[in-house]
């Protein structure tokens, strides 16, 4: 399974590179820098296809988990800064293409882009190895509500502006499918609801999603966190 995932990630990087060359054949990318760790293979393949350098520009604190599933926006913002430390030498005076496996809330990439700028990057582009995540997951991953997803209701240009990137590119959903299907004749379909909003089980309706939204929303989590802090301070 690990080798299959590695091959899939490599294909995703290659497909992204091909899309970049179609959209920006005269691109000015100096270096590709992955967001550790899950985008490393895709980033290497992307850099190779573009014929540019691949560099590790962030040092990772491995005691901090995935930020997009952390409860509360305050905790996520704090954790991003604790999790990654930039290496200024890899950014100074360069046009950098940052690569991540996906963009969910936008909290992580927003801060990482600012880190790159603070480290001296001339321009900061951002590439997502997955298509825009526009809909909530209802099958076990504690992802945010639709309104908290940065891609929900926004165009690519609006997302780029929101996260502070000079340019943003996403994987095409058809390319993602082909990256996973290629070489595996047993695969004939995928669960893509976070990208296209088409849930495989018929019980997912507006009422269900509204209830899920109320339970998962950042506001409710932050209020609960605040209540716990207040209780602790009074004890």
Give each language-model segment a name.
Residues 1-235:
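PRPP-associated nucleotide enzymes
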């Amino acid at each position: 399974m690990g080798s299959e995932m590695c091959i899939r990630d490599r294909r995703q990087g290659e497909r992204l590179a091909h899309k970049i060359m179609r959209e920006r054949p005269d691109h000015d990318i100096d270096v590709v820098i992955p967001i550790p760790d899950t985008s490393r293979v895709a980033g290497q393949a992307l850099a190779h296809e573009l014929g540019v350098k691949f560099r590790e520009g962030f040092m990772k604190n491995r005691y901090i988990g995935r930020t997009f599933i952390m409860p509360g926006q305050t905790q996520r913002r704090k954790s991003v800064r604790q999790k990654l430390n930039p290496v200024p030498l890899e950014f100074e005076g360069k046009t950098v293409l940052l690569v991540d496996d996906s963009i969910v809330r936008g909290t992580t990439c927003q801060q990482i882009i600012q880190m790159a700028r603070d480290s001296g990057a001339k321009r900061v582009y951002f590439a997502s190895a997955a298509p825009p995540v526009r809909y909530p997951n209802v099958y076990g991953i504690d992802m945010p509500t639709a309104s908290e997803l940065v891609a929900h209701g926004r165009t690519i240009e609006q997302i780029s502006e929101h996260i502070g990137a000079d340019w943003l590119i996403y994987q095409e959903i058809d390319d993602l499918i082909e990256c996973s299907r290629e070489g595996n004749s047993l695969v004939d379909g995928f669960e893509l609801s976070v990208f296209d909003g088409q849930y495989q089980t018929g019980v997912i309706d507006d009422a269900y999603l509204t209830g899920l939204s109320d339970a998962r929303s950042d506001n409710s989590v932050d209020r609960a966190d605040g209540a716990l802090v207040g209780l602790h301070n009074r004890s």
